[in-house]
A protein has these predicted regions:
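Buried hydrophobic residues that stabilize the cores of well-folded domains
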Residues: 1-306
Length: 306
């Protein structure tokens, strides 16, 4: 489910209401990569999303290949000729992020690189549920079991505060301050008559020449496009477009960079329960296809095991 807040995030976004209503506890993304004119290779890559009882994401983790080893298998055919086949074996790391909430507000996000590095972000909110402070720490885990976290040492990496000023029903200004209480960035968000974001402008106080703008487009109730434009290094324009079927289910997404198509994504939905079944990601420049199959685990039976 694309939203203005997550349009350019690499991580998938889910609708908590649907997750809760269907009692989904976990979604596993099984990933296969394929190059054009080559056989698909299953490297056992996965992404897993776990949810709490409110349908909110509680943990996200994925496997990444850190080493590849070639293995040769020697055999003989029926005529006695020696055949040598080469296979790849992989060594994996599991990278994870855990999420903790107070009500629907995210109050802690903890990243773990799979080894010994932990980085956490703590969030505080005002009475209007607006984010007022973000503290980022490097942390250590005192537990010998990596699946259990016991807080050891904390080193503060950054501390940001957020102050808000509402100019009208359609505009909100947010000033970002560092740990010395000095302003370093301003964000001005404009909303339409339905309260939806239509653009966000960012200006850096200490480098006023750096400007960033996000624009959002809608068709009826549907979110159909997001565009980012920035000039921090070289000028870059990112644009995502979304298409929906007759049931208002997302079925196509295109991602552009400086008007060049970089990804074309197809979403296949199960007609019986309207759950996403698979994702096909086409990279035209590298001539590759990523095929993602989704497996759902509910409070009862895994959908793929039915």
């Amino acid at each position: 489910m694309p939203t203005p807040e997550t349009a350019f995030e690499p991580q998938h976004n889910f609708n908590p209401e649907i997750i809760k209503a269907k009692n989904i506890k976990k979604i596993t993304f099984e990933i296969i990569d394929k190059k054009d004119y080559e056989v698909a290779v299953d490297k056992n890559l996965i992404e897993i999303y776990e949810f709490n009882t409110d349908g909110l994401l509680s943990r996200y983790y994925f496997t990444s290949i850190v080493k590849t080893f070639e293995r040769q298998v020697v055999s003989k055919n029926r005529k006695g000729r020696t055949l040598v086949k080469t296979f790849n074996d992989y060594v994996y790391d599991t990278v994870s992020t855990s999420y903790f909430y107070s009500g629907n507000n995210l109050i802690l996000k903890r990243y773990h690189d799979g080894m010994n590095y932990y980085e956490s972000r703590y969030y505080r909110y005002d009475s209007l549920n607006q984010l007022t402070k973000e503290l980022r720490y490097k942390e250590t885990n005192n537990s010998p079991d990596r699946s259990v976290f016991i807080l050891g040492n904390q080193v503060l990496l950054s501390e940001d505060s957020f102050q808000y000023k509402k100019f009208s029903s359609g505009q909100l200004k947010c000033t970002l301050l560092n740990n010395e209480n000095r302003s370093y960035k301003e964000k001005i968000t404009n909303f339409d008559s339905l309260g939806r974001k239509i653009n966000v402008n960012e200006i850096y106080t200490s480098a006023a020449w750096i400007m960033q703008e996000n624009k959002y487009e809608y068709s009826g109730k549907k979110f159909v496009a997001a565009q980012f434009e920035g000039n921090a290094n070289n000028k870059v324009i990112l644009r995502n477009t979304y298409e929906y079927d007759e049931k208002d289910e997302l079925y196509s997404e295109k991602q552009f960079k400086n008007e060049t198509l970089v990804k074309e994504i197809s979403y296949v939905t199960d007609k019986n329960d309207s759950l996403l079944n698979s994702i096909i990601i086409r990279d035209p420049a590298n001539k590759t296809i990523r095929i993602v199959r989704l497996r759902y685990d509910t409070g009862a039976v895994s959908k793929s095991d039915r």
